[in-house]
């Protein structure tokens, strides 16, 4: 199984959108059993909050299903050992990510 984790600042917009877009692609290709896809934040600001209304609206516009129970979580050091791919949404998140996970990233 390929495990993918998308990372942004708050885990309510970009990383969440990337998570649901990739899940939709994988579902349409009938490959759900081959992937585990999630998203997380580098900050604690939005922890526990749901997906941003703008993100929900855009995903709805392009008919991408959203798990409305999704809540923002923060990446942990342990995630580095769980996921095959950790994808930061921009340079700032990559920099912050390097403070959280091991040196060899």
Write out the residue ranges for each language-model feature:
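Glycine/proline-rich loop-helix segments at beta-alpha junctions forming the active-site rim
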Residues: 60, 74-105
